[in-house]
Regions:
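Long, terminal "pre-/pro-" and other extracytoplasmic accessory regions
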Residues: 1-157
Length: 157
């Protein structure tokens, strides 16, 4: 009976491990694929997520007032979904060029985290200030950082 339980535990453990295995393509490769396909613009949102049983990178690119959303298969690098939306010129603001990079904002958040793991980042306007909204997983809880996209200052944790 003990042998059956051990085998069952090994099987369940390996299934759990395979679903959380790292993506075959890197974050940078996914960003490069989206930017190449978009033919310009700036990444304003990025995250690795599970959709329909497979891992995908969700990438949002703003090009002027056009928002392009891509889902990129994390295993193959293929674009599995694409949506494009024209944002109105009313309240929607076009994204300005930030002075600090996406990678620098991610680094700042991770440095101020307690053994956290990167989950998601979004570049947006908040109260008239261009900020990176960075989400970090710390164990079973998520921690959110608002980082000024021009100074790198953490505005809110």
């Amino acid at each position: 009976m003990k042998k059956i339980l051990i085998v069952g535990a090994i099987i369940l453990g390996s299934i759990g491990f395979s679903t959380s295995a790292l993506a075959a393509i890197s974050e940078q490769q996914a960003k490069d694929i989206a930017l190449k396909e978009a033919q310009g613009g700036q990444i304003t949102k990025f995250k690795l997520d599970k959709e329909n049983g497979r891992m995908v990178y969700e990438v949002e690119v703003m090009d002027g007032n056009i928002e392009k959303d891509y889902e990129i298969d994390a295993e193959t690098g293929a674009i599995v979904k694409f949506e494009q939306e024209q944002k109105g010129s009313g309240k929607a603001k076009s994204v300005n060029e930030p002075k600090i990079s996406y990678d620098k904002a991610k680094e700042i958040a991770l440095k101020n985290s307690k053994n956290g793991k990167f989950k998601e980042i979004e570049l947006k306007h908040k109260n008239g200030v261009l900020v990176y909204d960075v989400e970090i997983a710390e164990g079973f809880a998520d921690r959110e950082f608002l980082i000024d996209a021009n100074t790198g200052e953490i505005l809110r944790e």
